[in-house]
């Protein structure tokens, strides 16, 4: 996995993409398999990641994730390459392009299997196979992607508890595969085919022994031969990315996107919490969706209809809800079966207009799924668990009580719920009485619920939990039905989702990863994370997944582990704990370590069924009244995990909230206000030091012995021989011929002397940014030294050693250099401090009309060792004139050229050495000016701060020698003060916290202040003595001010070395 990190642009959201694996890649060599790797790119932003190389495989597995920063119009392109042939230009294996308008639909939907396509329609490369990915929003706390297992045919599932369900087939059945590898089953007794694996007779609740009546349903009178399903439709796990058949494939999200079985990723579930279930499938017409959301009282289900302006899919998409069955007198009445059964792949005739007509065998009427109108009133089939007679008395599919009976007729597309639910104008959802709206009533249109993002994510979470008994074969996914299923792949999809609705009610299922239905996580402009309830418009600091009476501080460190990288724990003025995310510069009350499993544990152990947190909004009454028989049918453990979270709401009038300029409504009502994210540089540095300390080995030393005369070359040879982990060990430096023992002071002096040599422009590695400004930039002509890239690698390692061990370098770079080190783009404003004249010229060009004034082209002349070299800013730029239309492009290219002119290789070598010690993600909280202070410290010296943070030993503030000492310091120039500070501490730079944070001996707890020690027993002819490891200067008791001034100046300017008298 790449270690690259890219800066976050304004207005972007963070999305984590997981590249799980690829399937059935094209084999282009006869004797060897490819070495595939995948490349992820955000178009137009420069964000590029590459997976590791999978050796010799047509089904590579990477399981790598990357965090992308996506804007509103950003698209994602994923390409697969063969590393063996990429250098020959023939390693392309396929690509997938996910446009911006589909990214939102795929976020949180689990793993998706996408077909690979060509880069352009003119490509002759053979492309085949699929890639399996997932997208997950990372702007809020999440538990990450669940585990996944890819079957031999490319289907994705969670780790099943066992493979006991794959028993031998019943007598008369045979397993076959289609040309594309999909498994289907042939019943030789009835001469029929089906996708779902049949069960042995006698299995409770899921028996698939077909009765004669059922066999009549599944038998096609025209299929006398035993062939594979003719022209099987593509599985709904595959998303068609073809655009006009050839172009780079854009993802086309259909109504079945949220019902694909590839999203059924789950953790293994204990067997003791499972029980037989029977599917109650509900089928929708193309272009419409059905949703299964939990009611707060009896788990009522609402139906969602996609707006008619969304594209309709050419294949049927089916959903289903699972019902936990119990013995009861209320049985679901099964309508008469159809007499014209269909084979699974072909069940939907097509109208001349290109729309698919779905035939209901009960009413013998066809309905066209074009615009949602003209739907005939039809009784419900038993596969939906509803009939026209009992629709008014049964509450919801999740509370239906009936014996395990199945109707083998193809699913009918039209569903009439017992209670129509419609959204009100203000966003709240209201529902009429179930009895007042009989199922299947005429009218031609159906009302629908406006599903919020939180509801969609909850439904996706429910589907992930529900597949407890999934196995490796696609046909055996979910609770199986022995009959045929209509709608091609859609019919199989409906039965695969047979246990989706019970997932949220199963306490043993994997805990949900997203927020409860109706909730959304948002961030204020000041970086404060809060939760917004969409139906009521109420905002709160409190995470709705955590009970209000639960204190997360009760959890031990062993249970939740340490804070993630870049996070810090603080407390408000009232003592409430909150957390600071330095990576994204946000604050929140929710502990980022609370994963889904911990949240599930909290809810199970401490939350009564009626007291789940809902962010201060009372749970509304259920939209569907529950009958006593329906309520009794719900077992105690079937209480939804988020039962107090509103999912369907009655029509209410929201009370007016006071409008706060900088905070949403409702956030000031609580007792504690979440602090804003502050640009606390000291706090960031403290967090960085904590992270670096965890990376430092507990034993061993990084030993360097160099001479003062050859400090540059000897340091270069020693450091370039070391490994990165050796440089992270405790640094110990010794100068040859000196007796100084390094407790930090010798290392500071070594870095001070080395940085002055290393950054000296006379060596040709760096140059001053301009004549009157002594900031440094990389010299584009450093190539005169054939080993210059190795030296830049050494410079990067030296910068990393200084930062890792808490030291400062004596030298400063330009602001664009630090921005490049942070992987931030360079803008026109960055050039002002480096070249003011050029900045004024380019700014005037942007603000003025240059037509007929400037005759420049997209090329620049550069003087390299006396020779004029023309550099084209873009291909063919010498012949492209700069006009009013393209001047902004010219300025952008020119600014990039000004700072990257001939230094790309040098900077990459330097950055490589730096990142070997300091991972780039640790520097994300810092900007370029803060990084400058981290590397170089503060060059200006504040005498008052120095005096106020000085410790006195064997003297007081009123001692004569101490008063004289400060008089001498005040009389010194800035350069002499820096040399005095370097003489005493080993470094001429002040830490960014000031003199109160001067670092003392290595391993000391806390800082060590500057110390003046008056040595009374030392002759006054001696010079002052410095102890750099302890930041201490020993002053003899000089008799006069002038003597003290002369001796101190002589010691600063002329002494050199340790233990030298």
Curated annotation (Swiss-Prot):
Chain positions found as Phosphoserine: 262, 416
Protein name, entry field: E3 ubiquitin-protein ligase Smurf1
Domain HECT: from-to ranges: 723-1061
Residue ranges of domain WW in the record: 167-200, 513-546, 561-594
Zinc among keywords: no
Catalysed reaction, written as an equation: S-ubiquitinyl-[E2 ubiquitin-conjugating enzyme]-L-cysteine + [acceptor protein]-L-lysine = [E2 ubiquitin-conjugating enzyme]-L-cysteine + N(6)-ubiquitinyl-[acceptor protein]-L-lysine
Known EC number: 2.3.2.26
Effect of residue 541 to F: Abolishes interaction with MAD
Originating species: Drosophila melanogaster (Fruit fly)
Description of how the protein assembles with itself and partners: Interacts with phosphorylated MAD.
Signal among keywords: no
Pathway named in the protein's UniProt entry: Protein modification; protein ubiquitination
Region annotated Disordered, chain positions: 143-176, 188-496, 608-661
Keywords associated with the record: Developmental protein, Phosphoprotein, Repeat, Transferase, Ubl conjugation pathway
Pfam families, alphabetized: C2, HECT, WW
Taxonomy, superkingdom: Eukaryota
InterPro entries: C2_dom, C2_domain_sf, E3_ubiq-protein_ligase, HECT_dom, Hect_E3_ubiquitin_ligase, WW_dom, WW_dom_sf
Biased composition (Gly residues): 480-494
Gene Ontology biological-process annotations: embryonic development via the syncytial blastoderm; embryonic hindgut morphogenesis; germarium-derived egg chamber formation; male gamete generation; negative regulation of BMP signaling pathway; negative regulation of hippo signaling; negative regulation of smoothened signaling pathway; positive regulation of receptor-mediated endocytosis
Region (Interaction with MAD) location: 513-602
Gene Ontology CC annotation, any one: cytoplasm
KO phenotype (gene knockout): Flies exhibit lethal defects in hindgut morphogenesis.
Residues carrying Phosphothreonine: 412
Domain C2: 1-116
Lineage, highest ranks first: Eukaryota, Metazoa, Ecdysozoa, Arthropoda, Hexapoda
Biased composition annotated in UniProt, kind: Low complexity: 274-300, 311-322, 360-378, 393-409, 608-617, 624-656
Enzyme class: transferase
């Amino acid at each position: 996995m790449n270690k690259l990190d890219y800066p976050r642009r304004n207005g972007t959201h963070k999305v984590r993409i997981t590249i799980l694996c690829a399937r059935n890649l094209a084999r282009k060599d006869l004797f060897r398999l490819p070495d595939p790797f995948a490349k992820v790119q955000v178009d137009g932003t420069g964000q590029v990641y590459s997976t590791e190389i999978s050796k010799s495989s047509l089904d590579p597995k990477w399981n790598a994730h990357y965090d992308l920063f996506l804007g509103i119009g950003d698209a994602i392109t994923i390409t697969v390459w063969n590393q063996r042939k990429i250098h020959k230009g023939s390693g392309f294996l396929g690509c997938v392009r996910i446009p911006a308008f589909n990214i939102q639909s795929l976020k949180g939907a689990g793993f998706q299997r996408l077909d690979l396509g060509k880069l352009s329609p003119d490509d002759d490369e053979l492309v085949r196979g699929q890639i399996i990915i997932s997208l997950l929003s990372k702007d809020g706390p999440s538990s990450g992607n669940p585990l996944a297992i890819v079957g031999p045919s490319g289907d994705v599932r969670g780790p099943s508890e066992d493979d006991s369900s794959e028993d031998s087939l019943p007598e008369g059945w045979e397993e076959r595969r289609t040309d594309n590898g999909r498994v289907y089953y042939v019943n030789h007794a009835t001469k029929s085919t089906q996708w779902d694996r049949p069960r042995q007779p006698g299995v409770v609740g899921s028996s698939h022994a077909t009765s004669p009546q059922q066999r009549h349903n599944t038998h096609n009178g025209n299929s006398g031969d035993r062939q594979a399903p003719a022209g099987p439709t593509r599985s709904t796990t595959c998303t068609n990315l073809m655009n006009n058949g050839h172009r780079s494939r854009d993802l086309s999200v259909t109504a079945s996107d949220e019902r694909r079985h590839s999203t059924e990723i789950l953790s293994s579930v204990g067997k003791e919490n499972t029980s037989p279930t029977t599917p109650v499938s509900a089928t929708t017409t193309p272009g419409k969706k059905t949703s299964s959301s939990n009611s707060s009282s009896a788990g009522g289900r609402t139906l969602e209809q996609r707006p008619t302006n969304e594209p309709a899919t050419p294949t049927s998409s089916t959903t289903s809800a699972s019902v936990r069955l119990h013995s009861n007198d209320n049985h679901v009445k099964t309508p008469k079966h159809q007499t014209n059964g269909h084979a699974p792949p072909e069940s939907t005739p097509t109208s001349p207009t290109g729309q698919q007509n779905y035939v209901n065998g009960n009413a013998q009427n066809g309905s066209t799924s074009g615009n949602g109108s003209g739907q005939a009133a039809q009784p419900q089939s038993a596969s939906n668990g509803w009939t026209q007679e009992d629709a008014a008395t049964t509450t919801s599919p999740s509370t239906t009580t009936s014996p395990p009976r199945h109707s083998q007729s193809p699913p009918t597309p039209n569903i009439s719920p017992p209670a129509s639910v419609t959204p009100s104008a203000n966003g709240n959802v209201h529902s009429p009485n179930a009895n007042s709206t009989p199922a299947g009533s005429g009218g031609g249109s159906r009302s629908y619920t406006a599903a919020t993002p939180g509801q969609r994510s909850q439904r996706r979470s429910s589907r992930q939990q529900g597949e407890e008994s999934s196995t490796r074969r696609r046909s055996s996914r979910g609770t199986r039905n022995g009959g045929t299923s209509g709608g091609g792949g859609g019919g199989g999809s409906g039965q695969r989702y047979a246990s989706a609705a019970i997932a949220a009610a199963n306490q043993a299922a994997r805990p949900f990863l997203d927020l409860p239905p109706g909730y959304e996580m948002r961030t204020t402009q000041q970086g404060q994370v809060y939760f917004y309830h969409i139906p009521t418009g109420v905002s709160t600091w409190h995470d709705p997944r955590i009970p209000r009476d639960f204190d997360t501080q009760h959890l031990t460190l062993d249970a939740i582990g340490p804070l993630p990288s870049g996070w810090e724990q603080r407390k408000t003025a009232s003592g409430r704990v909150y957390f600071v995310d330095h990576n994204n510069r946000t604050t929140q009350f929710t502990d980022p370590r609370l994963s889904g499993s911990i949240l599930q544990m909290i809810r199970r152990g401490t939350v009564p069924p009626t007291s789940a947190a809902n962010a201060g909004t009372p749970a509304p009454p259920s939209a569907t009244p529950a009958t006593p028989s329906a309520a009794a049918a719900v077992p105690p453990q079937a209480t939804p995990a988020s039962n107090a979270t509103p999912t369907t709401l009655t029509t209410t009038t929201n009370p007016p909230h006071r409008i706060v300029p900088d905070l949403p409504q409702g956030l000031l009502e609580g007792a504690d206000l979440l602090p804003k994210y502050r640009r606390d540089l000291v706090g960031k540095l403290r967090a960085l030091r904590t992270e670096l300390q965890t990376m430092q080995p507990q034993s061993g030393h990084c030993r360097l012995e160099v001479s003062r005369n050859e400090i540059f070359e000897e340091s270069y040879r020693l450091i370039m021989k070391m490994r990165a982990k050796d440089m992270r060990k405790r640094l110990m430096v010794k100068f040859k011929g000196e007796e100084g023992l390094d407790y930090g002071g010798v290392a500071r002096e070594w870095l001070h002397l080395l940085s002055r040599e290393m950054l000296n422009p006379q060596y040709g590695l760096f140059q001053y940014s301009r004549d009157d400004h002594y900031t440094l930039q990389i010299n584009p002509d450093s190539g005169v030294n054939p080993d210059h890239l190795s030296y830049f690698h050494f410079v990067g390692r030296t910068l990393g050693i200084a930062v890792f061990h808490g030291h400062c370098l004596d030298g400063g770079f330009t602001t664009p250099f630090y921005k490049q080190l942070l992987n931030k783009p360079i803008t026109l404003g960055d050039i002002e401090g480096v070249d003011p004249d050029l900045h004024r010229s380019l700014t005037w060009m942007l603000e003025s009309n240059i037509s007929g004034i400037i005759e420049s082209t997209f090329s620049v002349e550069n003087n390299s060792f006396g020779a004029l070299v023309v550099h084209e800013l873009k291909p063919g730029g010498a012949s492209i004139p700069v006009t009013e239309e393209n001047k902004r492009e010219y300025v952008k290219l020119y600014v990039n050229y000004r700072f990257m002119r001939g230094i790309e290789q040098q900077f990459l070598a330097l950055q490589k050495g730096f990142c070997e010690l300091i991972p780039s993600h640790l520097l994300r909280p810092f900007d370029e000016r803060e990084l400058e202070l981290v590397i170089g410290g503060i060059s200006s010296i504040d005498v008052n701060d120095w005096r106020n943070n000085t410790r006195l030993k064997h003297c007081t503030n009123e001692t004569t020698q101490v008063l004289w000492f400060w008089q001498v310091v005040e009389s010194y120039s800035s350069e002499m003060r820096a040399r005095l500070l370097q003489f005493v501490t080993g470094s001429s730079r002040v830490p960014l916290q000031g003199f109160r944070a001067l670092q003392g001996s290595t391993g000391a707890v806390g800082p060590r202040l500057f110390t003046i020690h008056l040595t009374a027993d030392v002759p006054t002819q001696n010079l002052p003595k410095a102890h750099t490891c302890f930041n201490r200067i020993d002053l003899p008791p000089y008799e006069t001010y002038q003597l003290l001034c002369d001796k101190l100046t002589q010691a600063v300017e002329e002494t050199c070395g340790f233990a030298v008298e």
